[in-house]
From Swiss-Prot:
CDD domains: NUDIX_Ap4A_hydrolase_plant_like. Residues 6-149 form the Nudix hydrolase domain. Its cofactor is a divalent metal cation. InterPro entries: Nudix_hydrolase (IPR020476), NUDIX_hydrolase-like_dom_sf (IPR015797), NUDIX_hydrolase_CS (IPR020084), NUDIX_hydrolase_dom (IPR000086), RppH (IPR022927). This is RNA pyrophosphohydrolase. Coiled coil: none annotated. A motif (Nudix box) lies at residues 38-59. It comes from Psychrobacter arcticus (strain DSM 17307 / VKM B-2377 / 273-4). Belongs to the Nudix hydrolase family. RppH subfamily. Its EC number is 3.6.1.-. One of its GO terms (molecular function) is pyrophosphatase activity. It comes from the Bacteria. Keywords: Hydrolase. PANTHER family: ADP-RIBOSE PYROPHOSPHATASE (PTHR43736), DIHYDRONEOPTERIN TRIPHOSPHATE DIPHOSPHATASE (PTHR43736:SF1). The gene is rppH.
């Protein structure tokens, strides 16, 4: 679903373990890592889409996770011009996302799999909460920062998770 401004409705998933680390997934055929995310289908709520994407991309069911928080507003990013498909209608110039923070207890990590439906990832790892800010593709970095900052208070193990400075784009984790 693309809105009147050209932004595709989408959900992003930050899946945290009980140590406050987050699941960081590698896209098939690329040296690109990101959080699971995906589009909202017509008739779906963001929550419905999040659970569908959780199953399709990571192989987890709602019973495997606890929902901790959701971003209050839509977070938007624009695609660089080279990624915009100008022959497509309606024209999509970026994504607007609702971000979900989920907790996955250790026993349920055994259910993570990438062979459900059309696989998008082929590897994953647990990383520190702020690590993705220094690794994600540049045009998603602002949305990742806003989502992580908004959701960190809801992470049970937030002690010691310092919010990085806004202007520090060479983050070391």
């Amino acid at each position: 679903m693309i809105d009147a401004d050209g932004f595709r409705a989408n959900v992003g998933i930050i899946l945290a373990n009980t140590q406050g680390q987050v699941l960081w997934a590698k896209r098939i055929g690329h040296n690109a890592w990101q959080f699971p995310q995906g589009g909202i289908d017509r008739g779906e709520t963001p929550m419905d889409a999040m659970y569908r994407e959780l199953w399709e991309e990571v192989g987890l069911h709602p019973r495997h996770v606890d929902l901790l928080a959701v971003t209050q507003d839509w977070l938007r990013y624009r695609l660089p011009k080279r990624y915009v498909r100008h022959g497509q209608y309606p024209l999509c110039i970026g994504q607007k996302q609702k971000w979900f923070l989920l907790r996955l207890d250790e026993p349920n990590t055994q259910h993570i799999r990438f062979d459900e439906g059309k696989a998008e990832f082929d590897n994953w790892q647990w990383v520190s909460y702020w690590y993705p800010l220094g690794q994600v593709i540049h045009f998603k970095r602002g949305v990742y920062r806003r989502a992580l900052q908004e959701l960190v208070p809801e992470l049970p193990l937030q002690q010691g998770l310092i919010i990085p400075e806004q202007n520090n784009h060479l983050l070391q984790f």
